[in-house]
Design a protein with these regions (language model features):
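Acidic, proline-/serine-/threonine-rich low-complexity intrinsically disordered segments
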Residues: 1-53
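Short solvent-exposed coil/turn linkers within tandem alpha-helical repeat scaffolds
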Residues: 70-78, 107-115, 144-156, 167
Length: 167
């Protein structure tokens, strides 16, 4: 605490020793799951509450909760699933246009993630219901092209393409 003493000159102080008086010991590298993402406080609970509303068929409440989740936790690792579920809730309300936007947000938010094949299928199917058949066909064809190993979404996309008369 040289600065508290009147006659102290910091430039003339000897080099300080390490704290504890010993030499520094190199620490081993940190191992384990440091690359994982952590959820914010309440994030998982908020997601589960929205999911419960969807599962209970309370579509309006689910839409509100998933929208609030999206606003409260931008960049969440659950964002793609939240947007997919919001789309399903909007479909439950009969709002196909907004559902399509939610499916697009889900896919765009993580186009290689675990829900991407389903989100892309749902987007294509919603476009078909909106009468945008050519865009629906292109989008549905992309499911198999991008995610050939995703058996259920690929089969669903092919079925929807047949129903829409895609070539």
């Amino acid at each position: 605490l040289c600065e508290l003493e009147i006659d102290c000159d910091i430039s003339k102080l000897p080099e300080a020793s390490t704290l504890g008086g010993g030499t520094a010991v190199p620490q081993p590298p940190v191992t384990g799951n440091t690359g994982g993402t952590e959820l914010a406080v309440g994030e998982e609970a908020d997601f589960k509450a929205a999911e419960a509303a969807l599962e209970a068929g309370d579509f309006q409440r689910a839409v509100e909760l998933f929208a609030a989740f999206d606003q409260s936790y931008p960049g969440s690792p659950l964002a793609a699933q939240a947007n997919l579920n919001r789309g399903r809730a909007l479909d439950g309300l009969g709002d196909t246009r907004e559902a399509a936007r939610a499916y697009l947000a889900s896919f765009s938010g993580n186009s290689t993630g675990p829900v991407a094949p389903v989100a892309l299928f749902e987007l294509g199917a919603a476009l078909g219901r909106l009468g945008q058949v050519s865009q629906a066909c292109v989008t549905l064809a992309e499911v198999a092209a991008r995610f050939p190993a995703a058996a259920d979404p690929v089969a669903s996309a092919r079925g929807e393409m047949t129903a829409l008369g895609c070539s």
